Amino acid sequence: MQVDIGAILTGYAQGYFLMADEETGSLAWYGTEQHALIPLDERFHCPRSLRPLVRGSCFQVRINGAFEQVVEGCAARPQTWISSELKQIYLALHQAGFAHSFETWQGDTLAGGILGIALGAAFIGESMFYRIPNASKVALVKLVEHLRERGFRLFDAQLMNPHLARFGAFLMDGRDYQELLQQCLRIPCRFD
């Protein structure tokens, strides 16, 4: 399959995201009137119960250590929007330096991870998974720390859910989001 990286990046740069229909597998662009953002400032909240795991040595963090395994982990659900075509797109974006995996490990075991796309100072979180309890939560906290250190200004989680709300996620309307995204696209940041 030939992937038009430029066209894919243009879609993300306009605030859209790709999803496959769970039943047919057909791929389409989706937009939302409000984007769920993970704050990269003092509004970010690490739940108290998670703090010992974040400070401890239970999980080690790696970047892009097992990208394909993270994609597979994110897709391994009874119903998934990550089709085989979308997996190929993520792999092409990864090979081009845009898609990344942020992983938690226990020894030699991949415990969990987050899949996302970095464009300028924006990180667009596509999906996350865990195999060991709390691994994806620790990955989220450590990813926020990493994005702060690298100068990122936007962490787009796309759609709100109660899990993200526990970390301080908030909704931003489309117009404000577009303005922030366009600013971030002009700021060079290196993810890895």
From Swiss-Prot:
Coiled-coil stretches noted in the UniProt entry, renumbered to this chain: none
Protein's UniProt keywords contain Acyltransferase: yes
Pfam families: Leu_Phe_trans
Record carries keyword Zinc-finger: no
Localization per record: Cytoplasm
Reaction(s) the record says it catalyses: N-terminal L-lysyl-[protein] + L-leucyl-tRNA(Leu) = N-terminal L-leucyl-L-lysyl-[protein] + tRNA(Leu) + H(+); N-terminal L-arginyl-[protein] + L-leucyl-tRNA(Leu) = N-terminal L-leucyl-L-arginyl-[protein] + tRNA(Leu) + H(+); L-phenylalanyl-tRNA(Phe) + an N-terminal L-alpha-aminoacyl-[protein] = an N-terminal L-phenylalanyl-L-alpha-aminoacyl-[protein] + tRNA(Phe)
Any single biological process term in GO: protein catabolic process
Listed EC numbers: 2.3.2.6
GO MF annotation terms: leucyl-tRNA--protein transferase activity
Entries under InterPro entries matching the protein: Acyl_CoA_acyltransferase, Leu/Phe-tRNA_Trfase, Leu/Phe-tRNA_Trfase_C
Keywords: Acyltransferase, Cytoplasm, Transferase
One GO cellular component, as annotated: cytoplasm
Family: Belongs to the L/F-transferase family.
Function: Functions in the N-end rule pathway of protein degradation where it conjugates Leu, Phe and, less efficiently, Met from aminoacyl-tRNAs to the N-termini of proteins containing an N-terminal arginine or lysine.
Protein name: Leucyl/phenylalanyl-tRNA--protein transferase
